[in-house]
Amino acid sequence: MDSDSCAAAFHPEEYSPTCKRRRTVEDFNKFCTFVLAYAGYIPYPKEELPLRSSPSPANSTAGTIDSDGWDTGFSDITPSVPDRCFSHLQPSLLQRAKPSNYLLDRKTTDKLKKKKRRKRRDSDIPVKEGFRESLLKLEAADPYVETPSSPTMQDIPQASADPCSGWDSDTPSSGSCATVSPDQVTEIKTEGKRTIVRQGKQVVFRDEDSTGNDEDIMVDSDDDSWDLVTCFCMKPFAGRPMIECNECHTWIHLSCAKIRKSNVPEVFVCQKCRDSKFDIRRSNRSRMGSRKLFLD
């Protein structure tokens, strides 16, 4: 490349098509925009400025030669060729050239969906908490306790007004139930889970068991067996439930025998009879062993 021919590029009237120049960053950017527009990634620029009028960077080595040399490289291609060849493809390319807008719309829709999900979760959380609190309250409440606010229990008279309520139908004295005034009903004491209530000449024992199967026991205090002592605990009958041993026919309190009133066995053997059987077997073994030694 001659210096004279390159120097002529500074004067447009002395421009020669044989002069070549170096490509600049601006030329590369223009080429990239053309390729992207051709591929459909970006739309075509609305106004294409003439390449010769674009100023070159101040720090470029070739100066204005760069702008003239870009036209020389594409001098054989007329500017109307892309418009003729690809004019029918421009609408489709413009439709394909909207991935960035589509992504933005998709992001906005995703954000809206996330917000809706958060609102639903926030609305579901207090409902779940209220349901759990109601369950905890129901579990904590005793199912056997009668609440005064319930409409069904308001019509039913309380147990203190009816002295016959809660008595066992199998007891002989339950048939002849006399009316007792509230003044005669006095609570004597409470022993553990048992409540002793005196109603005139009758005493009612009420056991508060967790199972709720135990019933009240009514015993006449004038009975001869009231002060009878038969159990091994050396305490009187006193109206407490008892069971008879099938071996020694001794009456023992259910509490001493560790038997629940809801689970009374048909055959019962007291602890003394069991121990005596064990002692008899052990003594027989010792006797047989001593006899064998004596015979030997």
Swiss-Prot record:
Residues 237-244 are annotated as: Interaction with trimethylated histone H3 (H3K4). GO terms for cellular component: nucleoplasm; nucleus. The keyword Zinc-finger applies. Gene3D superfamilies: Zinc/RING finger domain, C3HC4 (zinc finger). Subject to proteasomal degradation. Stable when bound to chromatin. The soluble form is rapidly degraded. A zinc finger (PHD-type) spans 230-276. SUPFAM superfamilies: FYVE/PHD zinc finger. A motif (Nuclear localization signal) lies at residues 106-123. Its main location: nucleus. Keywords: Cell cycle, Cell division, Chromatin regulator, DNA condensation, Metal-binding, Mitosis, Nucleus, Zinc, Zinc-finger. GO terms for biological process: cell division; chromosome segregation; DNA damage response; mitotic cell cycle; mitotic chromosome condensation. This is PHD finger protein 13. The lineage of its organism: Eukaryota, Metazoa, Chordata, Craniata, Vertebrata. InterPro entries: PHD_PHF13 (IPR041947), Znf_FYVE_PHD (IPR011011), Znf_PHD (IPR001965), Znf_RING/FYVE/PHD (IPR013083). It is found in: Nucleus; Nucleus, Nucleoplasm. Residues 51-73, 97-126, 145-183 are annotated as: Disordered.
